[in-house]
Design a protein with these regions (language model features):
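Non-catalytic, conserved peripheral segments adjacent to functional cores
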Residues: 1-105, 124-126, 133-184
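Ligand-binding loop in jelly-roll beta-barrel domains
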Residues: 115-131
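Conserved SET/PR-domain catalytic core that frames the SAM/AdoMet-binding pocket
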Residues: 103-120
Length: 184
């Protein structure tokens, strides 16, 4: 298992070791000891999974303190473009984002720490997306930023006319309207 630092501090790409033969493959998708030695102490409290069709875009979501969440995300089947936006005021990468292609084939994972907005777009016919979170979901602390904000300039790998976004995500505030609750 490799833990790869990215250009945004505290965000990591994780590449598991995959052992395959004619029967299929085996991989260790999470190891607490290795994770904590390489990244940070963590206590995941919930695993979630979603299935989406091509063009679905979920995001950009986060939860405000005290229910802010770190996430460990992966694509079990299909192909997604996963995005994390730094919301930590005072961070040298505040307002910047990282995009990583996660696929059922490459088995990569992305660790998104607290203080980031997160989203993904589905690039394949369908995709199964799984993620761990380190804090409970709380609807009253649920928040987000508009996925197509020109200040963020995120290329989601889709044409705008093929994007399917929830009604809730269509009315999220733009970056210029956003007041971050996070500090670096």
């Amino acid at each position: 298992m490799k833990f790869i630092k990215t250009e945004i501090s505290d965000v990591y790409i994780i590449e598991p070791s995959v052992f395959g033969d004619e029967r299929g493959y085996f991989l260790e998708s999470f190891n607490l000891k290795k994770f904590e030695e390489s990244i940070c102490p963590i206590k995941f409290v919930q695993d979630n999974e979603s299935k989406s069709s091509k063009g679905v875009l979920r995001g950009l979501h986060f939860q405000k303190p005290p229910f802010h969440q770190a996430k460990l995300v992966r694509c079990v089947e299909g192909n997604v473009l996963d995005v994390a936006v730094d919301l930590r005021k005072g961070s040298p990468t505040y307002g910047k984002h990282i995009s990583v292609e996660l696929t059922g084939e490459n088995k990569k994972q992305l660790f998104v720490p607290r203080g980031f907005a997160h989203g993904f777009s589905v690039l394949s016919k369908t995709a199964v997306f799984a993620y761990k979170v380190d804090n409970d979901y709380s609807p009253e602390y649920d928040a987000g930023i508009r996925w197509n904000d020109t200040n963020l300039n995120i290329n989601w790998g889709l044409e705008e006319n093929e994007v399917l976004v929830s009604e809730k995500d269509k009315v999220l505030p733009f970056w210029s309207e956003f007041d971050t609750p996070f500090n670096f």
